[in-house]
Amino acid sequence: MITGLVMKSFKSWDQIEIVYQEWGEQTDLPPVVLHHGFVVDANANWVAPGIVDALLGAGRRVLAPDARGHGQSGKPHDPDSYGEQRMARDLAVLLDVTGEPQIDLVGYSMGAIVSLIFASEEERVRRLVVGGVGSGVIECGGVDRRAIPNDTIIEALSVDDPTTLGKSGATSFRVLADALGADREALVAQASSIYRGEIGLNGISARTLVLAGEDDPLAIRPNVLSEAIPDATLMMLTGDHIGAIADPDFARSIVDFLA
């Protein structure tokens, strides 16, 4: 069972409040920073599946922010306040506020894009783990929009009556948002500002692990991504975009790689 949780917050570079959770004691290794995916928050992505427990069991200190527009962090409805580049700047402020000279960084899906951007621009990342992304990072820029077109996600999050939606990947985002009580206007703002540019993957100096579910439509051909990062290893897991996190090897591989 997780113990030692401390909730903290800070005003980011544009005065949006970012809330983060902190567990564990300072060690000789850098803290592990966990960045969650779209719609969910730190609890849903990292606490509930046991990732935080696994890291604490290995003696690590863990920091897990709720991204802007998600969880307990600030939720402006202006699309100009969003995008993974802005979230990467939030990570930089988190390190400045906590005084951490170096971190191990783990990101999933949207959080993987944030983490790749951050690691490509910063030298404060010792080791990097990204999951739930694949060739789309290079071929689309950011999260792969070929499997689930972005406009369908915006529509699914915007309609008043979700029963009018058919079964689709976009509908699953609406179901998840409603289950978590998420601010759908904030999520639409983020979806409207999704990162679409090139990421300087060859500038990533951290040793990197790419994790992908075999049946994840958002992480097709992950070898294309791992081969574009100078010092990267690819590990395949069972399951789709959500199911891969439940694979016991997901948590185990993160702990082992960051040791």
What are these regions (language model features)?
Residues 185-200, 215-217:
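Active-site nucleophile elbow and catalytic-triad environment of alpha/beta-hydrolase enzymes
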Residues 217-223:
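Conserved alpha/beta-hydrolase "acid-adjacent" motif
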Residues 53-57, 63-102:
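Active-site loop/oxyanion-hole signature of alpha/beta-hydrolase fold enzymes
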Residues 232, 237-259:
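Catalytic active-site module of serine/aspartate enzymes centered on a nucleophile-bearing elbow/loop
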Residues 130-192:
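Helix-rich cap/lid subdomain of alpha/beta-hydrolase
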Residues 204, 210-212:
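Short beta-strand/loop motif that positions the catalytic acidic residue
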Residues 101-139:
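Conserved hydrolase catalytic core segment
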Residues 16-74:
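Conserved HGGG/HGGXW glycine-rich cap/lid loop of the alpha/beta-hydrolase fold
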